[in-house]
Structure formats: structure tokens, C-alpha cells
């Protein structure tokens, strides 16, 4: 058997990992500006944490979850999304306690798992960046969180991003709309896809979310959920729209957007961008005011979003965005002869401890091959160290571009490499 990675997974090699690290660092910096702190939850949870919160009838639970019984006969699932585990942690760790400053703002970056057909930007193990804000029902929380995602896209240079907005209203509004949708779709049941016929019985709002051609045709003239919002829900949605306009964040109302998870209420949103003629969702989220209570905590409003790192990086690449990744090395040591081996290690380690990136040859290659490595690493400075240099206690360091060089004692290298670097690179 040829040993390979499982279908739908990937190896992220150093060249690509640098791009991932850059995007993650921009996200962390952005979230910290909004007073978010990082949370890390287990990669696997008890099955009920996901099934009950995400919804027993959702595609995630019925088709996509990786679940199994462990050796203690516990029903376990690999996390398919980030919100439910964070809410579970919020309740379990009593972050609702009065001594904890509200709202509680948390972000996460990590692997998620769904069994689905692998395709561009969609894998069975994928990586998600997400945020969750607990404790504020104020519509300004909705808008601030949406604005934070918008701010992140601006920082990354992503273009042509459109905010799609909708409201699912209160549970009462949603129930009234659910019945209206059933009444509308039932006469055309036979025209729906098999999946949507099932959804009509279990979760009719999900028919609106279908990508099947026959379903899209069926819901074209479906009633709008916005016509079923109660007074409080209407006021919340109007406030969200007003504040988005105040922040100059353009949006479009999309009444067919319902999101794929059952726990949302009031504001839901997606950021969509066009890539090679296709519309791709880059980020999505919304409000969930009942989820904390569902996990046994006090009734606590919540709002959050998630975005897929693979898809985000694919969009960055397709839009031709060059990420400012530092790839240069400060110094490369070419080593000649066994007599220089120990001193080379001593010098390169001393240089690193002064805050510089450094590498040396370990393979005993010819000098030409070592210089080629220095070029590959984009080394700014190159030093050649042989047995004669070790005996003299000094060596020549040269600027790898200008070829300017200077002879430097080992003592200076080990204690004041910053001055040497500045002298050669200025």
C-alpha cells in the first residue's frame, strides 16, 4: 500500500505556510484592535454538542460529520464548525459570571472536519478563522462584528467584496414565516429536488438555501421573511442597516439567505466576492441569542462569523494579491573543512541569539554549491569560514548583492553583529 495523505486533506509546505502565517497574523492583529482574545477548544467534542446545536436535520449532521464511538463507548465527533464548541466552553467555564467583563469577545483559528466532496477551496479537513461575541443584544454589536470582517478584507487587499444581509427575526417571526413557506412550497413539492422535499418536512427554510436549479426556480416568488418580522425584529434590522450606512459599508438585502445552521436569529450575513466569474462566499455569520441557554447557561445574546482559510487564500491568489512575506535571510555561513565545523556552529548560534536569521552548510559541499544555497535563501550577507579563518580568529563577511566586504573578528561577530550588518548593508 502506498502511504499517502487521506482524500480531502493537504500538506501545507513551508512556502505556502508562510502565506498562512501572514494571513493569520493579520487576523490576530485585527481582532486584537477590537478587544478579542483567542480561545482554543478541542478538535473533537461529544456528538450532542454539535448535533443539538447545529440541528439534527442539517446537512452537516445528517451527511457531513465525522463521528465515532471511542474505546469508552462515548459518541464523539470531530468538530465541523467553531461556534458550538466555543459556546460549550463559554458555559462550561462560566464566562457568563458577573466578574467577567462583558461583552466577552473570543476568536479562534483551527482545523474543522466535514465529509464532503473535495473541491477547490473546500476540503474534508479545512481551517477556519472565527469570532464570537457574547453578552450584547445591541445591534451595534452586529455591525461592529461585520465591520471587523470588512476591515480584515481591506487589510488583506481583497477586492470586490459585497455584503449580503438578511434577518431571520425572533423565534416567533421565524415560526410564522416557516408556516407561510410551507403553504407556498407544498403545492409544488414534486418540482423540488429530493433533498428539498426532505427539507420541506424537516426544515423548510433550508429550501431557500438550495443550489439545485429546480429549487432556485421554485423559490423565486416565495414570500419574504422580512414581511413576517415583528416590531422588535424590524427595529433591530433597521438599526443594523442604519449603522452600516453610517460606517460606509455597502450591502444588499438577500431574502433567500438563511444560513445552513439552525441556531441563528435576527441578523445573518455573508460576504461574497467574484472569482473568475463565480460568486464565492468568503465569510458568513450572524446572531444566535438562544444558543448559550441551550447549553445550560443563562440566556445570553451572541453574534459571530466564520471564514475558511483555504478559500480566503485561494481568493487572494486568484485576485493577484502579493502578500508582503519576508523571505530574505540575514547571513549564510559557507563552511570549508572539518576544522571549521565546530566554530561555524558556535558563530551561527551566537548570531541567531542576537536576533538575526542565519544558516550554515552541514553537508561538506564545494564552495560553489554553498554560494548557490546562499542565493537560494536570499542571504543578505555571506561569510566563508575555513581552517585558516579559525586559526586567525577572524573572517571576511560580504554583502551578497554589492559584493562589498569587511574582515571581522569572531569576538565582534558574537557580540555586536548588528553593527557589522549595518556597516555592510547601509
UniProtKB/Swiss-Prot annotation:
Reactions catalysed according to its record: tRNA(His) + L-histidine + ATP = L-histidyl-tRNA(His) + AMP + diphosphate + H(+)
Signal peptide: none
Cellular component GO terms, alphabetical: cytoplasm
Enzyme class: ligase
GO MF assignments: ATP binding; catalytic activity, acting on a protein; histidine-tRNA ligase activity; transferase activity
InterPro entries: aa-tRNA-synth_II (IPR006195), aa-tRNA-synth_II/BPL/LPL (IPR045864), Anticodon-bd (IPR004154), Anticodon-bd_dom_sf (IPR036621), His-tRNA-ligase (IPR015807), HisRS-like_core (IPR041715), HisRS/HisZ (IPR004516), HisRS_anticodon (IPR033656)
Gene3D superfamilies xrefs: Anticodon-binding domain, Bira Bifunctional Protein, Domain 2
Cellular compartments annotated: Cytoplasm
Family classification: Belongs to the class-II aminoacyl-tRNA synthetase family.
NCBIfam families named among the record's database cross-references: hisS
HAMAP family from the UniProt entry: His_tRNA_synth
Subunit structure, interactors included: Homodimer.
Name recorded for this polypeptide: Histidine--tRNA ligase
Upper taxonomic lineage: Bacteria, Bacillati, Bacillota, Bacilli, Lactobacillales
